Amino acid sequence: MYAYLKGIITKITAKYIVLETNGIGYILHVANPYAYSGQVNQEAQIYVHQVVREDAHLLYGFRSEDEKKLFLSLISVSGIGPVSALAIIAADDNAGLVQAIETKNITYLTKFPKIGKKTAQQMVLDLEGKVVVAGDGLPAKVAVQASAENQELEEAMEAMLALGYKATELKKIKKFFEGTTDTAENYIKSALKMLVK
């Protein structure tokens, strides 16, 4: 089993990228290959998961360890295979995905590619309470608590995500507050003031 591969991205197609490591080109199936277009002919570290089938050995690649954990959670659901899991991750709506699972919003879940009503219900059954989004809006973390260093700030950012604020906005706000100490409530009040300006 591989944790990650480090090498040069040599090719990007609609379904995969090629990562060359020690003279070997690995085909890595990724959620959004074009997200790597700025890294062609540059070194990259891609987290991987290997799937072995009778007819093929496939490698799936991820931008972060958290994205890989989300993928593994998704493929643990009956009815979701690796291709469907990548399609869900490619939608780049991890906060919406988690919220829909927690609120049992089947209609929302069926908007993801290749997810029907039965599969959406199975997702809720299997993943409810097990998948949370990191407070900075980066790819979802699976069953991970807020970091101990500033749990109040993490809780505030999660609450703001739940209110519908964009992860990109919150990432900037979180950086502004890093190194400070306050309550989650005060962080939210300050963040709202910053967003209204």
From Swiss-Prot:
GO-annotated molecular function? ATP binding; four-way junction DNA binding; four-way junction helicase activity
Would you tell me the Gene Ontology cellular component terms? Answer: cytoplasm; Holliday junction helicase complex; Holliday junction resolvase complex
Region entry Flexible linker, spans: 143-147
Gene3D superfamilies, A to Z: 5' to 3' exonuclease, C-terminal subdomain, DNA helicase RuvA subunit, C-terminal domain, Nucleic acid-binding proteins
Instruction: Give the keywords, sorted.
Output: Cytoplasm, DNA damage, DNA recombination, DNA repair, DNA-binding
Q: Where in the cell is it found?
A: Cytoplasm
Membrane is among the record's keywords = no
Query: Which SUPFAM superfamilies does the UniProt entry name for this protein?
Result: DNA helicase RuvA subunit, C-terminal domain, Nucleic acid-binding proteins, RuvA domain 2-like
Q: Which GO BP terms sit in this record?
A: DNA recombination; DNA repair; SOS response
User: Where is the segment annotated Domain II?
Assistant: 64-142
The region called Domain I is annotated at: 1-63
Region of interest (Domain III), residue spans: 148-197
Family affiliation:
Belongs to the RuvA family.
| HAMAP family recorded | DNA_HJ_migration_RuvA
Q: What does this protein do?
A: The RuvA-RuvB-RuvC complex processes Holliday junction (HJ) DNA during genetic recombination and DNA repair, while the RuvA-RuvB complex plays an important role in the rescue of blocked DNA replication forks via replication fork reversal (RFR). RuvA specifically binds to HJ cruciform DNA, conferring on it an open structure. The RuvB hexamer acts as an ATP-dependent pump, pulling dsDNA into and through the RuvAB complex. HJ branch migration allows RuvC to scan DNA until it finds its consensus sequence, where it cleaves and resolves the cruciform DNA.
Q: What is known of its domains?
A: Has three domains with a flexible linker between the domains II and III and assumes an 'L' shape. Domain III is highly mobile and contacts RuvB.
Assembly: Homotetramer. Forms an RuvA(8)-RuvB(12)-Holliday junction (HJ) complex. HJ DNA is sandwiched between 2 RuvA tetramers; dsDNA enters through RuvA and exits via RuvB. An RuvB hexamer assembles on each DNA strand where it exits the tetramer. Each RuvB hexamer is contacted by two RuvA subunits (via domain III) on 2 adjacent RuvB subunits; this complex drives branch migration. In the full resolvosome a probable DNA-RuvA(4)-RuvB(12)-RuvC(2) complex forms which resolves the HJ.
Instruction: Tell me what this protein is called.
Output: Holliday junction branch migration complex subunit RuvA
